[in-house]
């Protein structure tokens, strides 16, 4: 039996940067409500909402101090309830971001846990005595640079944080932790949400003293327990962020009879411009044959029973047109090529805000312009290691997370129609040329390509259910594939070159053209 999310297209909203309704320079829930008609016109089926919970904002909301309250800057719980209801009136479901690998260090659990070694919340987190020299128990590193252990003077122990030191990791070995998470999830399910996107969910089975972080031995046991305790018997979509997933691992998450998740985000294609064995900042040119191999592997391996997620962009990744396309003279053409290539694959496509109008990266000239904690930490570490300042900034401009987080460009008025005040993060100065209002006026704009692709998915079962076959081409810059369902066959051809080219098919196809 099929589920709604198999036919759906999901749109990610980064609330801080989407629409400000009250003039404080920060996007909010009322701003999202104001723009629901725009999203309904685009045709999307669900909104993945980046975190809106109460947070001190060390990591832009991914450090949560109260899971059942709304961040003051974003509005109130009443605003949230109105958003859920108004979206549903437009047949749009709200998918919440579930961040339960860690909390904020300002969450009441951790505030209490750090006070003493014997209080009731101590075991909600992961603590260790220093080694004989007073150092951390091992050399686990934080994703945001530096060690993953922070010393707490108050109790003389280290606590684990795989991200910022203000994001202590929860101890999922503790059944009370797990039950508290499930209770919170049910709180939101009862409010009528459409599902959860699960932040770095592959880390919750960690065994840090064995230096196991991702894909730990109890991970799937925990997810099956979560499924039973919360969403398992409900018509919800669940997608797990799993940076280290292979197709074999992804099958464990998404095979229906295992009762875990609907699908996962895998990032194999996202690492193709990274030097092997190095960090994401260490760049190499994209290999188109490698991209074809990765997409084809995932399309083939997850062809039956399991399900793919399809995406180029999110709040952590640079804008795809700047990353792998031409964001100057061929910006629109690049955007259409990436859209067509992705949206006619099998799986559930995700659009990140602004992707549908071709928003691009915002280059910075100094570190003072950067907001992202990951980029700032990397800058300081690499500067101390002797890297040239210019080279570090080049890496930030290529891969830094602020690229995706610049405010949405609605029109050519001051501050791109995002806010009447100073925006929380710089707005790309190209907004007079790249904005929603202009895209809606131009019938051949990138926006209408996305709208058409969404319509094709809704109207043609071949896009949802058809099998995938890569088409061999002598030109490595051509990515062509077929979708086949019963007697129907679609051929999709995309060209990564900045010029017109031709290639020969081995057999004459019987095709009818669809204009996108």
Tell me the role of every PLM-derived stretch.
Residues 514-516:
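Conserved small/polar residues in nucleotide/adenosyl-binding loops
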């Amino acid at each position: 039996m099929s589920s709604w999310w198999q036919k759906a297209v999901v749109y990610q909203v980064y609330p801080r940067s989407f629409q400000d309704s009250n003039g404080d320079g920060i996007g909010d829930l009322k701003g999202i409500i104001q723009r629901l008609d725009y999203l309904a016109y685009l045709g999307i089926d669900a909104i993945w909402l980046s975190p809106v919970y109460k947070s001190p904002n060390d990591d832009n909301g991914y450090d949560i101090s109260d899971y059942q309250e709304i961040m003051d800057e974003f509005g109130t719980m009443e605003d949230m309830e109105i958003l859920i209801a108004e979206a549903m009136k437009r047949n749009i479901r709200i998918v919440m971001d579930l961040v339960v690998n860690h909390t904020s260090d300002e969450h009441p659990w951790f505030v209490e846990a750090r006070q003493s070694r014997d209080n009731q919340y101590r075991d909600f987190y992961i603590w260790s005595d220093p080694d004989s020299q007073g150092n951390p128990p091992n050399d686990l590193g934080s994703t945001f640079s530096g060690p993953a252990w922070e010393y707490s003077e108050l109790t003389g122990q280290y606590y684990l944080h795989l991200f910022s030191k203000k994001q202590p990791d929860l101890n999922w070995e503790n059944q009370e932790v797990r039950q508290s998470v499930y209770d919170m999830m049910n709180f939101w399910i009862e409010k009528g949400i459409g599902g959860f996107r699960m932040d770095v969910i592959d880390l919750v089975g960690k065994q840090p003293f064995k230096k196991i972080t991702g894909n730990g031995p109890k991970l799937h046991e925990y997810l099956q327990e979560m499924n039973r305790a919360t969403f398992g018997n409900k018509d919800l979509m669940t997608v797990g962020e799993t940076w280290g997933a292979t197709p074999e691992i992804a099958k464990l998450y998404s095979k229906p009879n295992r009762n875990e998740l609907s699908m996962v985000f895998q990032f194999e294609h996202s690492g193709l411009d990274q030097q092997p064995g190095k960090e994401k900042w260490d760049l190499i040119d994209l290999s188109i044959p490698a991209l074809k191999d990765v997409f084809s592997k995932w399309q083939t391996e997850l062809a039956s029973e399991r399900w793919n997620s399809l995406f180029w962009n999110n709040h952590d990744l640079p804008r795809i047109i700047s990353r792998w396309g031409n964001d100057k003279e061929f910006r629109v053409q690049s955007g259409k090529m990436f859209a067509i290539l992705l949206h006619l694959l099998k799986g559930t496509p995700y659009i990140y805000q602004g992707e549908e109008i071709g928003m691009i990266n915002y280059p910075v000239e100094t570190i003072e312009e950067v907001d992202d904690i990951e980029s700032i930490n990397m800058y300081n570490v690499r500067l101390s290691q002797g890297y040239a300042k210019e080279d570090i900034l080049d890496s930030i401009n290529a891969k830094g997370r602020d690229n995706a987080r610049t405010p949405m460009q609605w029109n050519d008025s001051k501050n791109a129609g995002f806010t009447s005040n100073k925006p929380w993060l710089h707005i790309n100065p190209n907004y007079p040329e790249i904005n929603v209002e202009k895209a809606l006026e131009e019938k051949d704009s990138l926006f209408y390509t996305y709208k058409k692709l969404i319509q094709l998915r809704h109207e043609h079962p071949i896009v949802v259910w058809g099998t995938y076959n890569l088409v061999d081409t002598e030109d490595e810059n051509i990515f062509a594939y077929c979708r086949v369902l019963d007697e129907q066959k679609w051929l999709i051809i995309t060209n990564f070159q900045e010029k017109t080219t031709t290639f020969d098919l081995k057999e004459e196809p019987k095709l009818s053209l669809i204009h996108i």
